[in-house]
Swiss-Prot record:
Cofactor: Mg(2+)
Keywords: Cytoplasm, DNA damage, DNA recombination, DNA repair, DNA-binding, Endonuclease, Hydrolase, Magnesium, Metal-binding, Nuclease
Protein's organism: Rhodopseudomonas palustris (strain BisA53)
Protein name, entry field: Crossover junction endodeoxyribonuclease RuvC
Catalytic reaction(s) noted: Endonucleolytic cleavage at a junction such as a reciprocal single-stranded crossover between two homologous DNA duplexes (Holliday junction)
GO biological process, one term: DNA recombination
Subunit note: Homodimer which binds Holliday junction (HJ) DNA. The HJ becomes 2-fold symmetrical on binding to RuvC with unstacked arms; it has a different conformation from HJ DNA in complex with RuvA. In the full resolvosome a probable DNA-RuvA(4)-RuvB(12)-RuvC(2) complex forms which resolves the HJ.
Protein family per UniProt: Belongs to the RuvC family.
Lineage, highest ranks first: Bacteria, Pseudomonadati, Pseudomonadota, Alphaproteobacteria, Hyphomicrobiales
């Protein structure tokens, strides 16, 4: 007879990177159960030079990491838009968003925006309102102050679901 897996809550930090507003959301996952822990955003002033904005994002995420002590992190991948310069700058913010948790020894998963939407809403082209409606169902205590914080919670939920699925596949030897 096999023993059930030892389920311990895993604290997950989801990050939605951006130069103007980097959203973050922290949840705990235990099996299929999700618990809201906190969310918010890091908002460096637009007047700062790029390097200082990136530093502000790093410092803000470092504070979140210290305050909430997550076990794992997940970051939303960036999409390429028509403005190559904007895409490049967003990529720099994403690099900072991946670096901050890696610097404290966390594994960092990456998820495409369409996968996040499909996981949370069931449709890969869901809009922000649909994501926020599903967040109210999945995390009733969450009241994200911005769409970026809501997106970060969606990234954390996506990671929680994918890690559970991966554990199930591993358990059956697939």
């Amino acid at each position: 007879m096999t023993q059930p897996p030892n389920r311990q809550p895993v604290r997950i930090l989801g990050i939605d990177p951006g130069l103007r507003r980097t959203g973050w959301g922290v949840i705990e996952s235990e099996g299929n159960r999700l618990v809201f822990i906190g969310c918010g955003s890091v908002e460096p002033p637009d007047t700062l030079p790029l390097a200082e904005r990136l530093l502000a994002i790093h410092r803000g995420l470092a504070k979140v990491l210290a305050d909430f002590a997550p076990d794992e992190a997940a970051v939303e991948q960036t999409f390429v838009n028509k403005d190559a310069g904007a895409t490049l700058k967003l990529g720099q913010a994403r690099g900072v968003a991946m670096l901050a948790p890696a610097m404290v020894g966390l594994s960092v998963a990456e998820y495409a925006p369409n996968l996040v939407k499909k996981t949370v809403v069931g449709a890969g082209h869901a809009d922000k309102n649909q994501i926020q409606m599903m967040l109210k169902i999945l995390l009733p205590k969450a009241e994200p102050p911005s769409a970026d914080a809501a997106d970060a919670l969606a990234v954390a939920i996506t990671h929680a679901h994918h890690r559970v699925a991966a554990a199930r596949l591993k358990a059956v030897g697939a």
